[in-house]
């Protein structure tokens, strides 16, 4: 398909999804320098919150170095052209968090639910529209629903007031044909004025290919992260996406060279470990497991002696979804007991 001249909005995830591999411990200085670099490079929309969205600070998800208010209050006044977004998961974030974000100057709110649970987003989407915010519905783990099922969920979000709906490959499981089937169906079903977005992860190295497939299907908003900093093997790498789009004639408004410098000079140096496709993040994509489970599974491996890969495969078999982080430990304990029992039988 010829995409020459097509315009898209690239939406940066470095300071939100990138909080997962940073264990939510980014400093305010790191936030400032990266946000300003992205802004100067021409990135139009930058997400800033705890990795699990507004209100994510908890025992279950992890305590951040600073509050959402501090992060947002630090970044927003510095932006010269970029707008700032925030993620909100109903049940974690509340309407009070939403109002706080609006007061601080957040432009875009993304209300995220599991891909079969759009009905829990009504209160938050309706309020965001009432507050005249750019309001996005965000359907996570989209590989776990059929194209027809996603159409029903997307239309619910649209009916509540979302002016954009995202199909989100939280596990990095989808292949380009999966993306085309789902986004194509949703694009056909939504009103022409309702935007379509795609959020990818790079666990099967499909981030770029899937994003381009999404654009082919009519997506106008594409998520990516500088140097791919995000859960699992990371998000679609922003600097690569921008370069590919430039080659294809897709207009992003982002400077090809400046965005490379942000990745190389600002983001890579703050990584606690390389964001790459290792056996555990590859397992996330292969088994269709929620990306932010990775570090939890690695911690459980250290604690219970069960390989993270085994834990992740079992989580995938059980169909665990975002929000069930407590079940990772439970699963590891169950597998450890099974291993011990098997070892005893062999010894006997």
Curated annotation (Swiss-Prot):
Top-level taxon of the source organism: Bacteria
UniProt record, GO biological process: catabolic process; L-leucine biosynthetic process
Binding-site list for substrate: 16-17, 170, 199, 290
EC numbers: 4.1.3.39
Gene Ontology molecular function, alphabetical: 2-isopropylmalate synthase activity; 4-hydroxy-2-oxovalerate aldolase activity; manganese ion binding
The species this protein was found in: Burkholderia vietnamiensis (strain G4 / LMG 22486)
Sites annotated Transition state stabilizer: 16
The organism's taxonomic lineage, starting at the top: Bacteria, Pseudomonadati, Pseudomonadota, Betaproteobacteria, Burkholderiales
SUPFAM superfamilies: Aldolase, post-HMGL domain-like
Keywords attached to this entry: Aromatic hydrocarbons catabolism, Lyase, Manganese, Metal-binding, Plasmid
Catalytic reaction list: (S)-4-hydroxy-2-oxopentanoate = acetaldehyde + pyruvate
Residue numbers annotated as active site: 20
Protein's UniProt keywords contain Zinc-finger: no
Protein name according to UniProt: 4-hydroxy-2-oxovalerate aldolase 2
Family: Belongs to the 4-hydroxy-2-oxovalerate aldolase family.
């Amino acid at each position: 398909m010829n995409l020459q001249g097509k315009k898209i909005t690239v939406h940066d995830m470095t300071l939100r999804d990138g909080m997962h591999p940073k264990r939510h411990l980014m400093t305010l200085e790191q936030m400032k320098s990266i946000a300003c670099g992205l802004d100067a490079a021409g990135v139009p929309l930058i997400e800033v919150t705890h990795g699990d969205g507004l209100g994510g600070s908890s025992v279950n998800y992890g305590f951040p170095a600073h509050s959402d208010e501090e992060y947002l209050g630090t970044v927003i006044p510095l932006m010269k052209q970029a707008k700032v977004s925030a993620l909100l998961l109903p049940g974690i974030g509340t309407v009070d968090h939403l109002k706080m974000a609006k007061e601080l100057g957040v432009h875009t709110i993304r209300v995220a639910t599991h891909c079969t649970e759009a009905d829990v987003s009504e209160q938050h989407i309706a309020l965001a529209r009432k507050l005249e915010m750019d309001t996005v519905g965000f359907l996570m783990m989209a590989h776990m629903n059929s194209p027809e099922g996603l159409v029903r969920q997307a239309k619910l979000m649209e009916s509540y007031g979302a002016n954009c709906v995202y199909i989100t490959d939280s596990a990095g499981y989808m292949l380009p044909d999966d993306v085309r089937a789902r986004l194509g169906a949703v694009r056909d079903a939504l009103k022409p004025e309702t935007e379509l977005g795609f959020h990818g992860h790079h666990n099967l190295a499909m981030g770029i290919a899937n994003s381009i497939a999404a654009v082919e299907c009519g997506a106008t908003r594409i998520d990516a992260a500088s140097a791919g900093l995000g859960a699992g093997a990371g998000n679609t790498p922003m600097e690569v996406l921008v370069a590919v789009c430039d080659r294809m004639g897709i207009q992003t408004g982002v400077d090809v060279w400046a965005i490379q410098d942000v990745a190389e000079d600002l983001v890579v140096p703050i990584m606690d470990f390389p964001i790459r496709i290792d056996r555990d993040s590859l397992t996330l994509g292969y088994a269709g497991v929620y990306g932010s489970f990775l570090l939890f599974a690695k911690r459980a491996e250290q604690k219970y002696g069960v390989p993270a890969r085994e834990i992740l495969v079992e989580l995938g078999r059980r169909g665990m979804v975002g929000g069930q982080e407590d079940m990772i430990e439970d699963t590891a304990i169950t597998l450890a007991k099974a291993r011990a029992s098997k070892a005893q039988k062999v010894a006997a």
